[in-house]
Amino acid sequence: MGARASVLTGGKLDRWEKVRLRPGGRKRYMMKHLVWASRELERFAKRHHGEQQSKTESNSGSREGGASQGASASAGISGNYPLVQNAQGQMVHQAISPRTLNAWVKVVEEKAFSPEVIPMFSALSEGALPQDVNTMLNAVGGHQGAMQVLKEVINEEAAEWDRLHPTHAGPIAPGQLREPRGSDIAGTTSTLQEQIGWTTANPPIPVGDVYRRWVILGLNKVVRMYCPVSILDIRQGPKEPFRDYVDRFYKTLRAEQASQEVKNWMTDTLLVQNANPDCKQILKALGPGATLEEMMTACQGVGGPSHKARVLAEAMSMVQNQGRADVFFQKGQGAGPKRKIKCFNCGKEGHLARNCKAPRRKGCWRCGQEGHQMKDCTGRQVNFFRERLAFPQREARQLCAEQNRTNGPTDRELWVPGGREEPGEERGREQSISTNLPQITLWQRPLIPVKVEGQLCEALLDTGADDTVIERIQLQGLWKPKMIGGIGGFIKVKQFDNVHIEIEGRKVVGTVLVGPTPVNIIGRNILTQLGCTLVFPISSIETVPVKLKPGMDGPKVKQWPLSAEKIKALTEICQEMEKEGKISKIGPENPYNTPIFAIKKKDSTKWRKLVDFRELNKRTQDFWEVQLGIPHPAGLKKKKSVTVLDVGDAYFSCPLDKDFRKYTAFTIPSINNETPGVRYQYNVLPQGWKGSPSIFQSSMTKILEPFREKNPDITIYQYMDDLYVGSDLEIDQHRKKVEELRQHLLKWGFTTPDKKHQKEPPFLWMGYELHPDKWTVQPIQLPEKEVWTVNDIQKLIGKLNWASQIYPGIKIKQLCKLIRGTKKLTDVVPLTPEAELELAENREIVSTPVHGVYYDPDKELIAEIQKQGNCQWTYQIFQEPHKNLKTGKYARQRSAHTNDIRQLAEAVQKIATESIVIWGKTPKFRLPVQKESWEAWWAEYWQATWIPEWEFINTPPLVKLWYSLETEPIPTTDTYYVDGAANRETKTGKAGYVTDKGKQKIISLENTTNQQAELKALLLALQDSDQQVNIVTDSQYVLGIIQSQPDHSESELVNQIIEELIKKEKIYLSWVPAHKGIGGNEQVDKLVSAGIRKVLFLDGIDRAQEEHERYHSNWKAMASDFNLPPIVAKEIVAHCDKCQVKGEAMHGQVDCSPGIWQVDCTHLEGKVIIVAVHVASGYIEAEVIPAETGQETAYFLLKLAGRWPVKTIHTDNGPNFTSAAVKAACWWADIKQEFGIPYNPQSQGVVESLNKELKKIIGQVRDQAEHLKTAVQMAVFIHNFKRKGGIGGYTAGERIIDIIATDIQTSELQKQILKVQKFRVYYRDSRDPIWKGPATLLWKGEGAVVIQDQGELKVVPRRKAKIIRDYGKQMAGDDCVASRQNED
């Protein structure tokens, strides 16, 4: 390896010559160590052959030794496992040594299929024959999942070998070796002598090297599975336990460099998609909302060691019967001409199936039949354990019989090709397959008579059994022992091959196992040859259960009168719908009714039936809108072939829940009440009912799912009844697929009328016009009107909004101003000059057609924004210049006072959201703003949670900040204290300022408010001050407006202030609390308050501030405890530098039952704090624990349960919470433990939020405590008893006590109510002497009782009521004792 000739020696060689065996690997090896290892491997591999070689050489002499060497060299055989020539001149094989096997097993156990395993296998198996390789593989005890994956790869490679090396028909010449098949190379069907013969032949066939190459391919696949570099590489092995797969999945997921949203998506999709087929079927059955706990419970026992046990049992039986004679496959002819490799999957030449990028073709690659994959095919299979006993050779690609049927049975049935014999037919002749196939129903056990080698018996057709097992039958011929696994364990059976079986008149030959079985079974090995298929009948579309809202009844709205022509039209429409089964006639027993009416269709004389479902919609349960928006053509990828379909009578093809149909009843009246009205109810989804869109979308998705899975190369966009079908197929193939789709929909009752079947462009779809390489909106005509109504303006704005997605530059702000306020649709609206100008510009824009292009996933998305003025923005999203994907506008003004940069930021967030919806990613932004202005804004704009990737583009007008506020007071300039006041009753006020130099100015105001007066005072100070000024105000309103740095406003007064601000060189604005004795502020406050407002003496301010400095109470607590106005309490909190709250997190809904606590561990200053939160009240228990262990956690839970009633705790899946100690504590204290979703903090939302709150309070009081545990308890005290708010305005401590007390009172009250309800009341009115009743007793007071009689609530004086216990119907006689018992 070059170390001997190195110029470096000693320590230098050690320092510099370092080698990584694996690219990117951590371990590095010294060159001399690698040289030593190579010598040791070479010496070690030859050591155990030395003795026999020396004997051979001494007996046969140098000539034989030379010949042996020559033979070996010519065959290219390594010295690791030499083929030596014995004394008789025969080539013999030296078996693999135990030391080599031990080294291999140790590698696998220590490395666990890490990448190092592959070079180790390659080195240890150098020169090995297939038998040696199988010996190595059999030595691996565990890792059956990996072995199964390896076995599948070998099966695929063996099948590929058979395809590329076909055998020739005819006998083999004497002395000539047969051609090796794939299973021969794998050592399954070949002897050791045959392997030696192939290896030493001239020319040689290196079967050992070929087999090693297959194994290395399989090991690569296993290594990728066990050591993934990305979450996308995680796959569950076929026999791998689901638990192990989940462990690997989450371990890799933690290391993924992705956002939490992406990780959540990976968990929701990849975990199920990459499970093995058995687990995936179970997981899909659980539904999309299944928790990880439910998944692991459902998949328990799937995979694992059971497969390994069965294989080992079979191997043991093979070993015990090694004395049996070997019977080999018949030898074939020499190899034919080499052919190009061809993929089993896609049929294309040039690559193998394992490297194919196309979606996997359904069905078996070997026999072509669906229902199994090649690895499960009943043809020849490779097994690591060598089966040396006799079994017949099968054709590798023999196709099973398959029948094409058009009419399926109504029940789930087994179909067997070949009918029963007719009485007059000869029983001995073979029957031809007819269309009159025997049908065996599965409503009962399918037991049928079977002839096995002429012996009649009864057997069960079992599609779940691999093998055919018969009991108590005598068969002739050779047999071999076998052990099979059943429900009760393993049973020993005899395996007979080539047995003749006759079922339903059809004869087949197959393998039968004879042994003790509870029932005779015909398994899949025979059913497949019979062509037997399991038929699942296609049922009608599954109905979605629907209910009314709780406590509501159906609609009972009377039908209003209708004209004669409408009654006639409705009668004809309903008669036709009844024939089609869409509606059914009902009788008078249905008490519900919804009014109907009729309108004429546009441009037609035909009538259209409408049902006024408004009342039913109010009473129907809410539905989740399955599809939240319409698909956009800018998100479509360019397709070679496109078709647009429309589903006819979409809603009327979906059935309505039978229990809900009665609520859709309606009535067709008669003229002059000639006859009773004809009553109908809907059997299908009605038009206008709130549930129809969601149910239809869900049903259509389920129906299209099988077609999508079968045709992954077809893109189908589905929105309601519009279908877009695109593909990259040639037009003829594409149209065939479209016809398949139409037939698929037709089977489910959905028609696609030819009238709306669009085959050629342009395609009209969802209001768009699609061309092969571009798209646009359908032609837009803006109306020309002299008089505009509100309704006309609304329609016009709708058209312009629709056009703006491809026509850049459209503005609608002035048009929207025309219809502000509450106006009738028919009110006439005069166009303002600004609106007329805006409309004219828009006409000019839409007069020239504009087209968009389709999305290319390989190119970058770019969004460019321009300012149009007047708070309006336009943008274009494109991938290539001048080829827009789509355009849009933004004109929303969230605040009355704003600036261009804030609006630009809002527009960027809107475009980013839109891009994620359409393309799944955000674009790169080009913004008309200087970098300094943009970064200055974002630095202060703390509400921002995301800053986009962007670049500057010089597109006038540029956006900039027109002025900025200083962060520190300006020392050399005047300070203006400003204030304003107004009287709410008289609307009069004053505004003014006082400077630190004694200058002052006060003006009087009319028809003003406090806020306007405050702003006017600021304006006065700005107008009278120099270029640099300090301004102090006590108004949060003024401070909030100016600190947002607006450059335009809807308020004229604010616009004047902005103009003055722009003129200044430097401005410093500060806030101080009012009425605190602050010099200038107090002075100006007295000036402007004189005669305007009454200032209350708030003596609680000082005490409130003192308490806040100590406990940092929130404003609600101070307002309540010290009788302060909310504004004053808020100002005290806002002025505290430790209580500047920057927004609050949004929370979802959690279970707030009284006994539920959320528990979590958080970390601070390197220590562990365990926190328990009472969910309903927000009350906290927390303490510092020595370590995050199960023992400490259990001790804390027991203390918590000793203080408060704890019914349920909700924790995460941390090891301390899942420990046995915690489980034991919960069991003892009778606490139910629930777990959140792993790695999803939202499932622990309450405690996660309060962890942050607790840390914030600790930070506020940390300097008051020496130890962290002291600060934690101080923070708990402050949170529980010094912070008010939430439900009831209580502190958390008051709230938990109130909740527990209320819960106890409610429970006791419920007991009393249940006790009271056991009594019945007889009563009488003052005017009626007859006793009435019995009525139900609801409440018993001191002077009266509350009863319910026939649904009516009544209050009856105690003296006029008799209360008796309800003893049941057996004592209901008039003279019974109960009738005379009076509770009084």
UniProtKB/Swiss-Prot annotation:
Domain notes: The p66 RT is structured in five subdomains: finger, palm, thumb, connection and RNase H. Within the palm subdomain, the 'primer grip' region is thought to be involved in the positioning of the primer terminus for accommodating the incoming nucleotide. The RNase H domain stabilizes the association of RT with primer-template. The tryptophan repeat motif is involved in RT p66/p51 dimerization.
Cofactor(s) demanded: Mg(2+)
Purpose: Gag-Pol polyprotein and Gag polyprotein may regulate their own translation, by the binding genomic RNA in the 5'-UTR. At low concentration, Gag-Pol and Gag would promote translation, whereas at high concentration, the polyproteins encapsidate genomic RNA and then shut off translation.
Origin organism lineage: Viruses, Riboviria, Pararnavirae, Artverviricota, Revtraviricetes
Site entry (Essential for RT p66/p51 heterodimerization), positions: 937, 950
Gene: gag-pol
Domain RNase H type-1 stretches: 970-1093
Binding site for Mg(2+) 2: 979, 1014, 1034, 1085
Activity regulation comment: The viral protease is inhibited by many synthetic protease inhibitors (PIs), such as amprenavir, atazanavir, indinavir, loprinavir, nelfinavir, ritonavir and saquinavir. RT can be inhibited either by nucleoside RT inhibitors (NRTIs) or by non nucleoside RT inhibitors (NNRTIs). NRTIs act as chain terminators, whereas NNRTIs inhibit DNA polymerization by binding a small hydrophobic pocket near the RT active site and inducing an allosteric change in this region.
Catalyzed chemical reaction(s): Specific for a P1 residue that is hydrophobic, and P1' variable, but often Pro; Endohydrolysis of RNA in RNA/DNA hybrids. Three different cleavage modes: 1. sequence-specific internal cleavage of RNA. Human immunodeficiency virus type 1 and Moloney murine leukemia virus enzymes prefer to cleave the RNA strand one nucleotide away from the RNA-DNA junction. 2. RNA 5'-end directed cleavage 13-19 nucleotides from the RNA end. 3. DNA 3'-end directed cleavage 15-20 nucleotides away from the primer terminus; 3'-end directed exonucleolytic cleavage of viral RNA-DNA hybrid; DNA(n) + a 2'-deoxyribonucleoside 5'-triphosphate = DNA(n+1) + diphosphate
Name this protein carries in UniProt: Gag-Pol polyprotein
Domain Reverse transcriptase: 580-770
